[in-house]
Design a protein with these regions (language model features):
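Conserved ABC ATPase signature
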Residues: 3, 44-48
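A short, proline-enriched helix->beta-strand linker immediately N-terminal to the Walker B motif
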Residues: 63-67
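ABC ATPase "signature
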Residues: 127-128
Length: 153
């Protein structure tokens, strides 16, 4: 909620999901620490930069302990430094939770993904690791593999 502080947003979401008072406090502290939100914990969400807002959004999603996290264009519109910081946060989650990430940035798909799926107009055209997609298309770069899959498959 834009008029709540970072801390209040985290507490609110944890409360909605039925965590008791102590668990709300514990989970809030965990998310503040995990996403380095301590320096902005008393700032209203609407005053945060795009990068901080994305980190808060992910923390709010994770406070509920989901099995799957959907990230739709998580770094769209972020500057290079904010994007790299968010990449580090996402990287740190690998192996702890299943993530499905949509992106138009090939370098993001390359650096963050264990498997990559290429969709065209809602149709799944190819799925595989980076190496598998490059081998499938006979290309050296993901961008070239993507273009070949989109244009020829």
């Amino acid at each position: 909620a834009p008029n709540l502080t970072v801390r209040e947003n985290l507490e609110f979401i944890a409360g909605i999901y039925g965590f008791g008072k102590e668990k709300v406090k514990q989970k809030t502290e965990e998310m503040l620490e995990q996403f380095h939100l301590g320096e902005v914990e008393n700032s209203k969400a609407k005053t945060l930069s795009g990068g901080w807002q994305r980190k808060l959004s992910i923390a709010m999603a994770l406070i509920t302990e989901p099995k799957i996290l959907f990230l739709d264009e998580p770094t769209l519109g972020l500057d290079v430094l904010a994007r790299r910081e968010l990449w580090r946060e996402i990287e740190a989650l690998k192996g702890k939770i299943t993530m499905i990430l949509t992106t138009h940035y090939m370098e993001e798909a390359e650096s963050l993904s264990d498997e990559i799926a290429v969709m065209v107009k809602g149709e799944l055209k190819a799925v595989g690791t980076l190496d598998e997609l490059k081998k499938l298309t006979g290309t050296e770069k993901l961008e070239d593999a993507f273009v070949k899959i989109v244009e020829e498959m």
